[in-house]
Amino acid sequence: MTQKLHIALLFGGNSSEHDVSKRSAHNIYDALDKEKYDVSLFMFTKDGILLGNEDSQKIFDGEPEDQVVAEAYQKMDMSSPLAPIMALNEQKEIDFFFPVIHGNLGEDGTIQGLFKLLNKPYVGSNIAASAMSFDKDLTKKIISQAGIRNTPYVVVTPENQADYSWGRIEEKLGNLTFVKPAKQGSSVGIHRVTNAEEYEKALDDAFKYDYKILVEQGIANPQEIEISILGNEHPIASKLGAVRVPKDDPFYDYENKFVDASGVVFELPVKLPQYLVDEITDMALKAYKALGMKGMARIDFLVDSNNVPYLGEPNTLPGFTNISLYPQMWEVSGISYSDLIDRLIQLGLQEFERNSKIKYDFRKLGTERVGQKKYNED
């Protein structure tokens, strides 16, 4: 009998997507084939503290989170903020990590750094790709260098804010712009801006979430198109999906995504001219490779009235809730939810195996390096 792979499913986190992460984790847990996998649960609280399997399971099973967390804190070694994390290292039976932590901590390279320290395989992109893809400014710099179309923008910080009055923004970008924190997910802190008063209010709010703010040129009445990517060195793309928001809503915001999605319509697969489908697919795959992403990503596009696509944002750990488009786009492309989860695990194992062959100490290379003398220590 083949030994089961022991999966650690990590969820929660200290971002605004804490509850979304819990819903994603439930779906992934249900989709994991228990004939193949043993599963342990580890939840990061809203304070960013990691709970063990027993307490995480209680919350997973529906016990009041605040009560379970309070009781867990009382019995937990809080002498060092690293204590709960180091306790994870003692779980020697864990073979593989499946993070479902959206936003900061989960998508900014932090949790990936922990997995690297623990020397364990995991689902998704590595530290660098996660960090670059989570920072909207870095993403735009990289995809622009790769020749991928995206909207013009400027970066506003507390230090240069005086240089970017609304008059200057309007001159550079026009009178329809979007103000966005550079490192936030799920449309948190994003504002549609058309005048000086809105601009000042938007900056004040966005600075609550980050000290680097993007002000992007807006596109009037765009189509919001999404595509799912799966793979490592040779990624594949799903069929495209569209998000149709109510006409009274300016864009697909946090409210639409997580509070009241009743007016949102998903078109799967979306009907677009084939040349446009091909262009978006090519842009998405090119961006995936340029950013060094692995495992999976959902990539968002805006398409203007002339059917010109602009790459919006990549998401290295997309949602897996009942309304999340990432798994739905694969469903309509012929890959079931459970098969998708299996593939993601296999991709993580393959990437770990590939990276394990890299030598980090040149003294151990000896004569393997062509044209270099064998290293001899004195």
Curated annotation (Swiss-Prot):
Q: Do the record's keywords include Metal-binding?
A: yes
Name of the gene: ddl
What lineage is this protein's organism placed in? Bacteria, Bacillati, Bacillota, Bacilli, Lactobacillales
GO terms for CC? cytosol
Q: Which domain of life is it from?
A: Bacteria
User: What is the protein name given in its UniProt record?
Assistant: D-alanine--D-alanine ligase
Q: Name one Pfam family in it.
A: Dala_Dala_lig_N
Question: According to the UniProt entry, what is the EC number of this protein?
Answer: 6.3.2.4
Q: Kindly list the positions annotated as binding ATP.
A: 170-225
How the cofactor is bound: the record states: Binds 2 magnesium or manganese ions per subunit.
Q: According to its UniProt record, where is this protein mainly located?
A: cytoplasm
All copies of domain ATP-grasp, residue ranges: 140-346
Subcellular location per UniProt equals: Cytoplasm
Listed binding positions for Mg(2+) 1 are 300, 313
Family (UniProt)? Belongs to the D-alanine--D-alanine ligase family.
Gene3D superfamilies referenced in this protein's UniProt entry, alphabetically: 3.40.50.20, ATP-grasp fold, A domain (3.30.1490.20), ATP-grasp fold, B domain (3.30.470.20)
PROSITE patterns from the entry?
ATP_GRASP, DALA_DALA_LIGASE_1, DALA_DALA_LIGASE_2
Provide one Gene Ontology biological process annotation. cell wall organization
Concerning NCBIfam families, the annotation shows: D_ala_D_alaTIGR, PRK01966.1-4
Keyword Cell wall biogenesis/degradation in annotation: yes
What would you give as a GO molecular function for this chain, any one? D-alanine-D-alanine ligase activity
Tell me which cofactor or cofactors this protein depends on. Answer: Mg(2+); Mn(2+)
What is this enzyme's catalytic activity, as reactions?
A: 2 D-alanine + ATP = D-alanyl-D-alanine + ADP + phosphate + H(+)
Question: What does the protein in this record do?
Answer: Cell wall formation.
